[in-house]
From Swiss-Prot:
Pfam families: DUF188. Belongs to the UPF0178 family. InterPro entries: UPF0178. It comes from Cereibacter sphaeroides (strain ATCC 17029 / ATH 2.4.9) (Rhodobacter sphaeroides). This is UPF0178 protein Rsph17029_2512.
Amino acid sequence: MTDLYIDADACPVKAEAERVAVRHGVRMFLVSNGGIRPPAHPLVESIFVPEGPDVADMWIADRARTGDVVVTSDIPLAAKVVAAGALVVKPNGETLTTANIGNALATRDLMADLRSADPFRQGGGRTFSKADRSRFLDALERAMRKAQEAGRSASGGSEAGS
Protein backbone atom coordinates (compact mmCIF):
# COMPACT_ATOMS: atom_id res chain seq x y z
CA MET A 1 0.00 0.00 0.00
CA THR A 2 1.30 3.43 -0.94
CA ASP A 3 1.96 6.05 1.74
CA LEU A 4 2.76 9.71 1.16
CA TYR A 5 5.30 11.30 3.52
CA ILE A 6 5.65 15.08 3.71
CA ASP A 7 8.74 16.69 5.24
CA ALA A 8 6.32 19.31 6.53
CA ASP A 9 8.49 21.97 8.16
CA ALA A 10 8.49 24.91 5.70
CA CYS A 11 6.80 22.83 2.98
CA PRO A 12 4.75 25.18 0.75
CA VAL A 13 2.63 22.44 -0.87
CA LYS A 14 1.00 20.62 2.05
CA ALA A 15 -2.55 21.47 0.94
CA GLU A 16 -1.87 20.37 -2.64
CA ALA A 17 -0.33 17.11 -1.44
CA GLU A 18 -3.36 16.47 0.76
CA ARG A 19 -5.72 16.88 -2.19
CA VAL A 20 -3.72 14.37 -4.25
CA ALA A 21 -3.51 11.89 -1.35
CA VAL A 22 -7.26 12.05 -0.73
CA ARG A 23 -8.01 11.66 -4.44
CA HIS A 24 -5.83 8.51 -4.54
CA GLY A 25 -7.11 7.23 -1.19
CA VAL A 26 -3.63 6.93 0.34
CA ARG A 27 -2.43 7.73 3.84
CA MET A 28 -0.45 10.94 4.18
CA PHE A 29 1.94 11.69 7.03
CA LEU A 30 2.82 15.33 7.76
CA VAL A 31 6.08 14.99 9.69
CA SER A 32 7.36 18.02 11.60
CA ASN A 33 8.52 19.15 15.01
CA GLY A 34 5.37 21.18 15.53
CA GLY A 35 3.75 24.38 14.43
CA ILE A 36 1.46 23.00 11.75
CA ARG A 37 -2.31 22.89 11.81
CA PRO A 38 -3.79 19.42 12.43
CA PRO A 39 -5.31 17.93 9.28
CA ALA A 40 -9.06 17.60 8.86
CA HIS A 41 -9.12 14.47 6.69
CA PRO A 42 -8.88 11.00 8.30
CA LEU A 43 -6.30 9.84 5.71
CA VAL A 44 -3.94 12.61 6.82
CA GLU A 45 -1.99 12.26 10.05
CA SER A 46 0.29 14.79 11.74
CA ILE A 47 3.43 13.27 13.20
CA PHE A 48 5.18 15.54 15.69
CA VAL A 49 8.77 14.52 16.35
CA PRO A 50 11.07 15.93 19.05
CA GLU A 51 13.16 19.02 18.32
CA GLY A 52 16.57 18.28 16.95
CA PRO A 53 18.55 18.17 13.76
CA ASP A 54 17.14 15.77 11.18
CA VAL A 55 14.69 14.06 13.57
CA ALA A 56 11.80 14.42 11.10
CA ASP A 57 14.08 13.24 8.30
CA MET A 58 15.07 10.13 10.26
CA TRP A 59 11.40 9.34 11.01
CA ILE A 60 10.59 9.45 7.29
CA ALA A 61 13.75 7.59 6.21
CA ASP A 62 13.00 4.77 8.67
CA ARG A 63 9.57 4.18 7.08
CA ALA A 64 9.60 5.08 3.37
CA ARG A 65 9.87 2.06 1.07
CA THR A 66 9.15 0.93 -2.48
CA GLY A 67 5.66 2.06 -3.40
CA ASP A 68 5.82 5.19 -1.22
CA VAL A 69 6.23 8.84 -2.20
CA VAL A 70 8.16 11.46 -0.21
CA VAL A 71 7.83 15.23 -0.65
CA THR A 72 10.97 17.02 0.52
CA SER A 73 13.53 19.64 -0.44
CA ASP A 74 16.11 17.96 1.80
CA ILE A 75 18.61 16.30 -0.55
CA PRO A 76 20.26 13.97 2.03
CA LEU A 77 16.79 12.72 3.08
CA ALA A 78 15.89 12.26 -0.59
CA ALA A 79 19.04 10.19 -1.11
CA LYS A 80 18.11 7.89 1.78
CA VAL A 81 14.54 7.27 0.66
CA VAL A 82 15.50 6.87 -3.01
CA ALA A 83 17.96 4.18 -1.88
CA ALA A 84 15.07 2.51 -0.03
CA GLY A 85 13.00 2.50 -3.23
CA ALA A 86 10.65 5.43 -2.57
CA LEU A 87 9.87 8.12 -5.12
CA VAL A 88 10.79 11.73 -4.28
CA VAL A 89 9.12 14.93 -5.46
CA LYS A 90 10.47 18.32 -4.44
CA PRO A 91 7.94 21.13 -3.82
CA ASN A 92 8.99 22.76 -7.11
CA GLY A 93 7.99 19.62 -9.03
CA GLU A 94 11.48 18.25 -9.60
CA THR A 95 11.68 14.49 -9.14
CA LEU A 96 14.73 12.86 -7.61
CA THR A 97 15.64 9.35 -8.71
CA THR A 98 18.55 6.93 -8.61
CA ALA A 99 19.62 8.49 -11.93
CA ASN A 100 19.96 12.07 -10.62
CA ILE A 101 20.32 11.94 -6.82
CA GLY A 102 24.13 11.78 -7.02
CA ASN A 103 24.24 15.01 -9.03
CA ALA A 104 21.76 16.63 -6.62
CA LEU A 105 23.98 15.72 -3.65
CA ALA A 106 27.11 17.02 -5.41
CA THR A 107 25.37 20.29 -6.32
CA ARG A 108 24.12 20.70 -2.75
CA ASP A 109 27.64 20.19 -1.38
CA LEU A 110 29.15 22.60 -3.91
CA MET A 111 26.60 25.30 -3.09
CA ALA A 112 27.24 24.83 0.65
CA ASP A 113 30.97 25.27 0.02
CA LEU A 114 30.36 28.42 -2.03
CA ARG A 115 28.11 29.89 0.67
CA SER A 116 30.68 29.20 3.39
CA ALA A 117 33.43 30.80 1.28
CA ASP A 118 31.46 34.07 1.06
CA PRO A 119 29.81 34.74 4.45
CA PHE A 120 28.60 38.17 3.27
CA ARG A 121 26.58 36.79 0.37
CA GLN A 122 22.96 37.62 1.02
CA GLY A 123 19.74 36.34 -0.42
CA GLY A 124 18.15 32.99 -0.74
CA GLY A 125 16.52 31.11 -3.52
CA ARG A 126 13.92 32.50 -5.82
CA THR A 127 10.35 32.86 -4.60
CA PHE A 128 7.94 29.96 -4.89
CA SER A 129 5.67 30.56 -7.89
CA LYS A 130 2.32 29.40 -9.24
CA ALA A 131 4.27 27.58 -11.96
CA ASP A 132 6.22 25.70 -9.25
CA ARG A 133 2.95 24.72 -7.61
CA SER A 134 1.55 23.51 -10.93
CA ARG A 135 4.71 21.51 -11.70
CA PHE A 136 4.50 19.99 -8.23
CA LEU A 137 0.91 18.86 -8.72
CA ASP A 138 1.74 17.26 -12.08
CA ALA A 139 4.85 15.55 -10.72
CA LEU A 140 3.08 14.30 -7.58
CA GLU A 141 0.20 12.91 -9.63
CA ARG A 142 2.66 10.98 -11.85
CA ALA A 143 4.65 9.78 -8.82
CA MET A 144 1.51 8.56 -7.03
CA ARG A 145 0.41 6.50 -10.04
CA LYS A 146 3.92 5.06 -10.44
CA ALA A 147 4.22 4.32 -6.70
CA GLN A 148 0.85 2.60 -6.55
CA GLU A 149 1.85 0.42 -9.50
CA ALA A 150 5.19 -0.38 -7.82
CA GLY A 151 3.36 -1.21 -4.59
CA ARG A 152 1.05 -3.61 -6.41
CA SER A 153 4.00 -5.27 -8.14
CA ALA A 154 5.94 -5.59 -4.88
CA SER A 155 2.96 -7.22 -3.16
CA GLY A 156 2.43 -9.69 -5.98
CA GLY A 157 -0.58 -7.86 -7.39
CA SER A 158 -2.72 -8.41 -4.28
CA GLU A 159 -3.83 -4.77 -4.31
CA ALA A 160 -5.17 -4.90 -7.86
CA GLY A 161 -8.68 -3.57 -7.98
CA SER A 162 -8.40 -1.66 -4.72
